[in-house]
Amino acid sequence: MALADKRLENLQIYRVLQCVRNKDKKQIEKLTRLGYPELINFTEPIDGLSALHLASISNDTDMVSFLLKLGAHPDVQDHMGCTPTMRAAELGHELSMEILAKAKADMTIVDNEGKGVLFYCILPTKRHYRCSLIALEHGADVNNITYEGKPVFLRACEEAHDVKDMCLTFLEKGANPNAINTSTGRTALMESSREGVLEIVRGILERGGEVNAYDNDRHHAAHFAAKGGFFDILKLLFAYNGDMGLIGMDGNTPLHFAAMGGFADCCKYIAQRGCDLKWKNLEHKTPRVVAKDGGFKAASKEIRRAERTAAKLAKTGAKNPNPLWALRLHDWSIEHETSLRNAFKFVDRGDGVVSKDDFVVALEERQEYATSEQLLSVAQMHEKSRGGGVNINEFFKGTKYLSKSYVLGSFGPKKKKRGLGKKPRKGKFVLPLPICTIPENAFPRRPDGGPPYYMIETYQNVSDSHRFNRDHPPEHPIQDDSEWYIDDPSRVFANISFITKAGDLASLKKAIETGIPVDMKDNTYKTPLMIACASGNIDVVKFLIEKGANVNATDNFLWTPLHFACHAGQQDIVELLVKAGASIDATSINNSTPLSRAIESCRLDTVKYLLDMGAKFQIENRKGHAAMDIAKAYADYRIIDMIKEKLDNLPKQADNQKMKGKLPKLKTEGTDVKKEEETLSSIYTVPAITEEKKVHRDSVVYLNSLITSGFTKKVDITFIPKRIWSPEATTAELIRKRELRRERFTYEVDFEDFMMPFQKNITEKAQALEATLKN
């Protein structure tokens, strides 16, 4: 079509495009009538878009119909060679595409890369599938090939898992089952096998797809199916005369790929169906070595078993009881069981048995893998007596002419045998660790039947968002009259721990003002101060300490807030808690101190601060490990040197003191147990909730007191607003808060995979250990 290259033409086409966006039909009609001839089909000079392109992209069916009536051509192409139909198909606009198809849009046009409209329909939505149906109904080429040599059917098979119905439709409409990408050598069968879609693989093979074609790397469909562990596809490929022993350019057979993934059933099947078990790839590894290197014991065991069988058959005079033609006949008969049973019905004697001759004739007409002599030998194996015939059910089982481990029924999960047998050996008793939660009945309920008190009401700053926001709050309570025309929102309750972790100070302040204790424990025994210390939220920690939170409160594991702060590696919070009176040597249920938690997190500054504040580093936990033992276990040499220096600075014992015996331990077992029992018993107590006493305003005593106090003579002109705007952090303050978080937690805090110091330390050491073991 005409390309606008002059200034006036540019202005007019841009004006038309703007009118299309604004849906100004009158102006479009006027420009078409008074402007340049064929202006409706002009394209803008940058992307080459016409008016019909824009209408199709926005799925404005009314505008598409209007433009077509004005003479817009449905096949105008942009700079990429795309028509409005292609643009509509790409976005799944089926309504616009249907209108364009009725306007006789040419569905065989290709873009600058040789892609037809069907290429733009290959996306995993129902709308794109319906667009492909519209294109096929109006003459789209199902065998369209790009200039690089990629057919549209092969492109769909690359996404077969998501567009299965579309691929099957392409096959039904006559797509070439042997579609091949000339640049890579990949076929549609290879791509559908790689995706693991059995229905498409079956459809391609039924329509004559070449099963043993291979790509530029000499990989064929069995390689891709084995790599993904698709056992059903491997069975299907072998049933259609697939070669399980083809060797790729990298020296890998399908068995190598199955061993790489540890697919035991696939390894067993491929090993039985003619693959070379001793073949080495370019890395000089056999399939069994590949499975062993990957740590797949089951796959390695199956390959080893097949190697033993192959070694026995390699001896002179040994006869193979499971020849390849018999295995292929068995797999083919299972794949075509329905059609074979229908064929055998016509010659059935009435008891599920057919004569030997009829059996041979029926199979000889339908397959070419076994000769008539071989089929006759199979029939004779099924005959119990001369002229007894072949039982159809036994033939499909395959156990009469194949070993039991070679038939398809031997694959898959084994069924448990019923009956008496040996009792299984009892394993070592493991005490189950219960999930420690406070019972719901231990929490007092609200008088109005609401949730437990650890579920607090969230604060909602309800106001007219069109007038006020966090950067432009109301200057005076009288200015904000939103309460008079905005409905009150419904009450929303959230766990106090979630509120604390999110740093919602407004909701916490509201809860404390309404009588919720500042040390209210949630159903996992954690107080808000513990949660704030664990998440590293110093603002919430300061707020809770100001409100009188207990800095020595314990959970069910006797962890204090200082334990959580040291475990999270938050130096500033540790200092804040110690200044507020936190016990620096508080022991948990396994006698671990906050110093132990700081060492586990490998936080040198926190460890140094605790030692400078007088933390006892000789205290041992239940396992008898002191601070030095824990530091060695977590392999932080900086902390080891620091503790060693402290140990060296301890005063040495005199000789006469050594003769008196060992020094008394810093802890005694009896007092420790007693302390634990007392602490554990107090864990289950939930703080009492103080209810406000409601004054009965209709009481005679109350009204009489008002009269005597002269309240009725006073004129109160105080204005009390219904709702007061709660100060919110401005955008600048939120940005500054994010900057501070990055300074405290590093830049990684903005990513989803951010980990606190302890978790990060453990993960890094585990990954390093895993890498060492692999090498």
Curated annotation (Swiss-Prot):
Pfam families, A to Z: Ank_2 (PF12796)
InterPro entries: Ankyrin-EF-hand (IPR052801), Ankyrin_rpt (IPR002110), Ankyrin_rpt-contain_sf (IPR036770), EF-hand-dom_pair (IPR011992)
UniProt entry keywords in alphabetical sequence: ANK repeat, Repeat
Entry keyword annotation includes Disulfide bond: no
Positions of ANK repeats: 47-76, 184-213, 217-246, 250-279, 524-553, 557-586, 590-619, 623-652
Keyword presence, Protein biosynthesis: no
Domain of life: Eukaryota
Database matches in Gene3D superfamilies: Ankyrin repeat-containing domain, EF-hand
Protein name per Swiss-Prot or TrEMBL: Ankyrin repeat and EF-hand domain-containing protein 1
